[in-house]
């Protein structure tokens, strides 16, 4: 759409591959149009507050960040024939379910490195083409370490969505 002179709003995920994401960015630059990915959690009052706290330095040095997302996604969500659960169309649990957590973390603390991960498919074999649970550990390029723990195998309902920040000036859990 940028080729036709339009600014574009893209629902998450922006792309499922680095190559596709780069195409979007390059088209935006080439045609001088804005492209926005829907990441509305940046505008929630708690997110705005914690961004102000981090940027102002009031929390001090960030030692650790822990993201937790434990949700229920069962056969009602992953209906056969739909895009949910299809690796090519859906991208996987981190793209569709937890990309907002990853965006908030990146927005607050910057890029990551030294990534190590473990994944499992506990409850969705036959329903999805990807894992439903995982642990991801990493370091922040600017210092500190972090982790993401997630699952869509929680029985009946969403259990937890949280961000724990451990700085030298206290602690914050959202």
Question: Could you say what each language-model-derived stretch is?
Answer:
Residues 1-42, 57:
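Beta-strand-loop-alpha-helix segment that lines the small-molecule cofactor/substrate pocket
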Residues 18, 25, 51, 103-106, ...:
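A cross-family signal for key residues in well-ordered alpha-helices
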Residues 19, 45, 157:
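Residues that form or flank phosphate/diphosphate-binding pockets in enzymes
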Residues 96, 102-174:
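Contiguous beta-strand/loop segments that form the cofactor/metal-binding neighborhood of enzyme cores
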Residues 41-127:
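Predominantly a Rossmann-like dinucleotide-binding segment in NAD(P)-dependent oxidoreductases
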Residues 1-3, 23-25, 50-53, 78-82, ...:
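Short, glycine/charged-enriched secondary-structure capping and boundary segments
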Residues 16, 73, 162:
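Short beta->alpha connector loops of Rossmann-like oxidoreductase domains
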């Amino acid at each position: 759409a940028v080729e036709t002179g339009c600014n574009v709003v893209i629902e998450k995920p922006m792309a499922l591959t680095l190559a596709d994401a780069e195409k979007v960015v390059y088209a935006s630059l080439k045609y001088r149009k804005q492209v926005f990915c829907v990441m509305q959690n940046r505008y929630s009052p708690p997110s705005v507050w914690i961004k102000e706290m981090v940027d102002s330095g009031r929390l001090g040095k960030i030692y650790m960040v822990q993201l937790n997302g434990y949700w229920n996604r069962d056969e009602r969500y992953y209906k056969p024939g739909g895009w949910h659960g299809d690796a090519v169309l859906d991208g996987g649990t981190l793209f569709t379910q937890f990309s907002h957590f990853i965006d908030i973390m990146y927005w607050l603390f910057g890029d990551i490195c030294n990534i190590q991960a473990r994944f499992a498919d506990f409850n969705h074999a036959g329903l999805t083409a990807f894992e439903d649970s995982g642990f991801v550990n990493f370091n922040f390029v600017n210092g500190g370490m972090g982790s993401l723990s997630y699952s869509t195998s929680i029985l009946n309902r969403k259990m937890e969505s949280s961000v724990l920040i451990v700085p030298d000036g206290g602690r914050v859990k959202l």
